[in-house]
């Protein structure tokens, strides 16, 4: 009788131990998820929602193609649901607060530094890059112009882009028409933005896919 009871207890213990080991193995086998805040002036496009969904789908496709030991997920500002939306100050503040929450959730940022309403990048995107940098999160960027201007562009040098899209002095190519100096440090945009990117890859990627691959390489190196 004692032996039967002991055998049952031993069997029960082994089953519990096996279940625990399987459970622990499953937990450790789960891939970590890294959230990417998708910053850029795409939110102003006529197809703003679709643009974000397309980028999120590309990230999902790259996950499947590369089978990384982690999963990358895009967080897009228009994922937020803003109740009682109106073109007023209160709505603007609530959008800002919702975007801050998304950035706090994100591990990194992929920012489109395309020229926007002038030779330089979108100011909201610039703030978001700075916010993520201040939070000690890696900053990555790319330059994608076709959705905005119907053609591909490369970022080039900021000083050259200013001369192309803003009036400059006839006497000095590094002075604008208002007599103000044009930043000239062999960078594609303002030095504070390029400086913030040194926490990530440091280079402005030429496509969205490229910037996601840069982010993947960053986490693979950890």
Locate the predicted segments by residue:
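Bacterial N-terminal signal peptides that target proteins for export
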Residues: 1-13
């Amino acid at each position: 009788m004692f032996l039967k009871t002991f055998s049952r207890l031993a069997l029960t213990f082994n089953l519990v131990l096996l279940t625990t080991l399987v459970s622990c193995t499953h937990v450790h086998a789960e891939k970590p998820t890294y959230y990417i805040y998708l910053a850029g002036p795409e939110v102003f496009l006529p197809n703003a929602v679709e643009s974000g969904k397309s980028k999120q789908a590309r990230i999902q496709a790259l996950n499947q193609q590369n089978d990384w030991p982690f999963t990358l997920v895009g967080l897009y500002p228009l994922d937020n649901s803003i109740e009682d939306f109106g073109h007023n100050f209160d709505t603007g503040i609530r959008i800002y607060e919702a975007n801050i929450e998304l950035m706090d959730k994100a591990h990194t940022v992929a920012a489109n530094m395309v020229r926007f309403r002038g030779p330089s990048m979108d100011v909201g995107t610039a703030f978001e890059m700075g916010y993520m940098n201040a939070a000690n999160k890696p900053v990555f960027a790319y330059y994608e112009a076709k959705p905005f201007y119907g053609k591909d562009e490369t970022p080039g040098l900021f000083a050259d882009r200013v001369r192309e899209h803003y009036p400059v002095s006839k006497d000095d190519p590094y002075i604008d028409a208002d007599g103000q100096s044009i930043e000239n440090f062999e960078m594609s945009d303002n030095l504070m933005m390029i400086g913030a990117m040194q926490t990530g890859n440091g280079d402005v990627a030429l496509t969205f896919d490229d910037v996601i691959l840069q982010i993947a390489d960053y986490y693979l190196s950890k």
